[in-house]
Amino acid sequence: MISPTHQSQYLNYFVNPVLMTESGDIIDSVTGTTTTTANMSNTTIDAPTPASTTKNYKHKKQNTNTGTSMSPSNSINSTNNNAAAAAATTTTSKKSKDIPLELTAFGTTPSGKPRLFVCQVCTRAFARLEHLRRHERSHTKEKPFSCGVCQRKFSRRDLLLRHAQKLHAGCTDAITRLRRKSIKKSQDGDDDDDDDDDDEEMANSEDENDHDESGNASTKNGKKDKKDPPPEFNLNLFNSKQKPTKANTTKSKVAKLSTTTSRKNSTNPTRKNSSSLHKQVLDQRQKAAVNTKIVSSTKIVSGTNSGVSITPTRSRRGASFSAQSGANYAINIPEFNDIYPQSDNVEFSTPQFLPSSLDNEMTWLNNIPNIPGLSDSVSAANLMRQNSITNSADHVTPPVNVSQHGSFSHQSTFSATDMGQTRSESVNSLNTPFDGSYMMPTVTISNQEIQNGVAAHHHHQQQQQHQQHNHQHQPNQSSLGLSRNDMLSEDHYGYSFYDIPENILNFPMDSISTTSNAMSSGPIQNFKPLSPITQEIEHEITPRIDGRIGDFQNNNNTNDNPIHQNINYDLNFLHTIDDIGQDVISKFMPGGYSFYGDNNVSATSSANDYNSPNNIVSPSQQNNQFALHNQSSHPSGASPHLNQAMMNKMRLHNYSSNKLFTNHIRHMINKALGKYPISGIMTPTIPSNEKLEFYLSVFIQSFLAHLPFIHPSKLNEYEIMAMTGNEDINNESARVCLPLLTATMGALLANNKNDAEHLYEASRRTIHIYLESRKTNSTNDKNYKNGKDKSSSGNPLWLLQSLMLSVLYGLFSDNENNVYIVIRQLNALNSLVKTSIKNKGPIFFSNNGEDEELYNKLNSHDNGTSLFSNNLNDEMRYKNNINMQSQTRIVFIIYRLTNFLLMMYNVPLTFSINDINQLAVTSKDEETLWNFKNYQEFQEFSHKNNKTLDDYLNHKNEPIIFRELLLTVIKFGISDSNISPEIEKKVTHQLQNLCKYGFNCLVHGIYEIKQYQEMKEVDTFKVLDYLTKFYPTNDGLGFNCFRLPANKDLEKIDYALLVDFTKISSIIDLKLLKEQSWLKNYQDLTQNYHRLLDAHSTGNPLNSINDYDYLKLADCCISVLKLILFKVEDSNSNSRNRSKNDPTNEINNKLNNNNNNNNDMNNNNSNGDQLISAFDTDFGYLNMDNNGYAKKEEFSRFTDDELRYDKENTMSYFDKHIKLDIFEEVEKSSNLIQAQMLFHAFSVLSIFSVYVMRKNDNNSSPFANTDLIFELNHRYSMVLRLLERLETFLKLRYQTSAGGGGGGVNNNNNNALSIKLEQEFTNLYLYNGNVLSSDHNTNTNTTNTITTTTTTDNGTKQNQHHSQDFGLEKTLYILKMGENVLNYIYDLNLKVCVFKKLGDSLSEIRKYLIDNESTLNG
């Protein structure tokens, strides 16, 4: 018997409910069609809904407590992960909602009101027309509310308000008027403008009004809600001793506040109660005047200096940003485990904050001008502001009655003291150094105002004390510290990113003590706080280039910084690049996404670690700051006019040219982090200077050696301060962005997870502050378009380098949504680069400071009459060449990064070769200059070898235009193209003079061109092998700027990997696997893998891959594995070590290096490591002629190569020219970029394994080519033996690490590694068995070569008998080993979660093969 409940569900699932509106029309709630009563007789009940729709219903989350139905978007989000099925049933699922009867036209509201307004789409009814109109937008997807900052559109104004609060901190430009309306609690913490729960929001919004009118309202399940009293506005909000109201007490004792509680407050009662505001203000001010005393201590949550205390009557709640419940979030100081930077914290420069109350706080501030006793005159306001600044200049903590958001705070901002105590609090009794983290970061105050206050403090101390004594009896003016006509209103709610300048941050200690004693000797004073954030009147502001608010006109200041003449900011860039931060939501707080793939709390965390390290100034820096302070402390009329550039030159002499992370840089990092405008979140911990220097060295050796776009000579304190010399002296964030990011990448490559995430968070914040200051500067500076130097762009080179590193770090996120966000960040960076290179000038990005002077000097007309000596002039030319190369290299590195995403994960290309235009690539001679650490090292080399700088700066050669060279080289791969000898000679000359990274860019360009359908016929193997002939060899210098040995050529290894991967992609299309492997859509991943198996099966007549292509695939995959996982050295450098200056030695090595691959495998290096051939394919078994062309001319024409070029010997031909020695030793890999090719290599090897298995099953055919089958089985054996060698190595490494020999691995990690060792490697024997175990301990020659010199029938039969063991278990073994290798890289080499994701993708493919074993074998 079916119960009534099940019967009702059955009808809801399989029968379209038919409802009637008040007009008499019948509406099908599933299809949305309307039938009039006249046609009612023709209406029939439709057939049951499809199974897919039924499945969607089963996944619905029914919300019976609130009496509302599930929104269409939620039903869609609850479906299965099959995108195709979900797309087919989206429309049906949206409309097929189970609307409760009480929510239709037949029901009433909880207060008894009839529902008169019916939705014509879903039959939902409402009691008010505006509720229906808002609900209808959930069907029409209309989004009329637009953000004024980032242009995002929203369907409801409350969503826009929440977006403005979360991402733009209530910025004025985001929304013209902030309406105080209740905002839905965010369930997931995102700022999506999706209408997932639009209907539920409407029901709650409607019902809460009914609850206010009726106290007997109940929910659907019969549970009654208590009637909340009408909200009252009172200034006791700012008194932490007040008794909690009933509304707060009711919900404070539960662990999580409900959404309804945060919405039951309405703004209308607040306005009604505003009449009593004046009385409350006067009462509080009188109370403050009577109860004036010093507060000795303040309760701080977990040691934080944010000045926010715990209010026990309020509990922690979710991330809702309702205007009525904003105070609940400003007091929401999380527990340590919540606020600590977890492993899912990778972000890019967007603030996250806890918004203060919009309703209570804003209403109070809006009524301040009406309070009796407050002056409205501008002059009085200016005087009060000046006095307030002067009196508070020596304080070392912020005023407790001003929130960290720059406006007056609510009750949670205060400690357990009353209003009067906080008003009279003085912190002069604390003789501690001023810490920048104590200052409220969003106070709007200019540098000149601070200087005037300091000057007044020194020269008018008697008058100052008198004014303070008078202000004690005038609490209405002094205690509030408000003096502007345009007090904060709804239309001018904003924030500022500027903190107290360093004049106050480094205030002399003796002045502080003196002032403190003077203050304590007199009467107790009321504290004069800094004024809260306001929007200044237009005539009060003067535009200044440093981005700070200008001085009042009535102030006589002659110490203004001169306006820079060479600034040409690109406003489009400012709006575009700042989206990099605005789109990302998660911060150094819970809820972010993980770059590391785990959720463990960092080991270096501390419950008291809520602030920056102490801003301890080094003695030299402290003296400098005292001198600067004394200079600025003179009366403003006596201050000299000093040119900013001249002052920068004077300071440069005090900076180190050998180290980057000095005490001075550390001090600026602390100050920059102290200016971060968001309160309530932890400040990252900066490692010691020694650690930072170590990370810098790792960055140079392991990162710049692969992607050389920053010259190491630029990574010291002197150069950093010089290249940022044009920035405002108080803008510390400009100086510390690039150093922090270099240390971040170094910590990542050093596998220090804690330091990497802390350093990245610090760099993210500093970039955000700098970008905001850039926008402010560009807006305020009216003359920035009148710069004299038109060659300089407004985008500094160091900023492009910093953004590139930041995007690269955050690119491989654990959350696919944030992956898309970071891709948009890269696209914004690409747009900036494309815009910058369109000017066709030599300078794409501005060179500041000395670099700019060098360029101008060397390119001036009177350069011939220079007074510089030749030696000094050569040094200038050398440095200028490094600067010009940096301009070009950053463009090509960003192009390579964008193209890499296309290669690895099929991300659409947004920076093409067509965008590069006529950009010339660096020549080999210029690259030689780049490889020297500095000019002194080049000078030493030139003296020994009788070389001059002109030999390397030979301008007679034509520039190598990258796009033209690429398109010409592609023609060599087209069979019917006729290339003239002149063109071929020109191309040969250019390739002979091309630098290494230029060859790597050419491979990326070839891959891009192959994506076009018209270029599918290009023979990629021919083109790439032709390029390899000209790949530059090391010059035998014996050293390089990357501090690597001469035989460690990482760029050449990258080139070989790119060539192998491009060849693989030209044979088999892996686009179906690439996207899903990154996004972890495992169902689509396995389906696409199945399509690949079917498309390339032996029985498919449409299979475009023949047996020879499969041999090439196997060879390329084996090469990829060896190049990434084994020790690789440059064989050409090894020969040069024996004879550096013998020019004939190079050709002899090229001729003899590959005469016999078997002989190469028997050679040993100095350490006794045995060489293995990375590219040995033993194609000689088929053609017996792989050595016949070895003595050809080295640089012969490509047409001559075609005579001896066939598809059997491509890998040996490539091996002949690349000259890489690969040893049997497995080496720790730090190749962050190219190591991701392992996923593709193992995936292709698994497809190759299935193909060989099926090929062997069909071997009984009389038409089978036994020779090819033998070669296929031979490659298969090579793959399995290589994996067995890796298995032995991984077991040893995991055992060593688990036993405590991993170097600093703690016990928890040891236990985890032991468990992993037991789980991951125990079942490998089941997959692999002992088929090849007898050969496991044989030498390398036997391991890699199982062929004989003769091809007898017995040998073939023996191989066929051996190949019968190559079943599905071997394919599973290949995938399992790929999973283990990727997990090993993640566990012990690079804590980058993309490797773990790729390993999981291989695991899913393996599980799919196990589940479909019968299909594959059949």
Swiss-Prot record:
Principal location class: nucleus
Listed Low complexity bias regions: 34-44, 68-93, 462-477, 1145-1167, 1338-1356
Domain of life (superkingdom): Eukaryota
UniProt entry keywords in alphabetical sequence: Metal-binding, Nucleus, Repeat, Zinc, Zinc-finger
Biased composition (Polar residues): 236-278
Encoding gene, per UniProt annotation: ADR1
PANTHER family given in the database record: MIP31509P, REGULATORY PROTEIN ADR1
PROSITE patterns linked to this entry: ZINC_FINGER_C2H2_1 (PS00028), ZINC_FINGER_C2H2_2 (PS50157)
Record has Manganese as a keyword: no
GO terms under biological process: cellular response to starvation; ergosterol biosynthetic process; filamentous growth; filamentous growth of a population of unicellular organisms in response to biotic stimulus; filamentous growth of a population of unicellular organisms in response to starvation; regulation of transcription by RNA polymerase II
Magnesium found in the keyword field: no
GO MF, any single term: DNA-binding transcription factor activity, RNA polymerase II-specific
Role of this protein: Transcription factor involved in the regulation of hyphal growth.
Protein name per its UniProtKB record: Transcriptional regulator ADR1
Entry's localization field: Nucleus
Lineage start: Eukaryota, Fungi, Dikarya, Ascomycota, Saccharomycotina
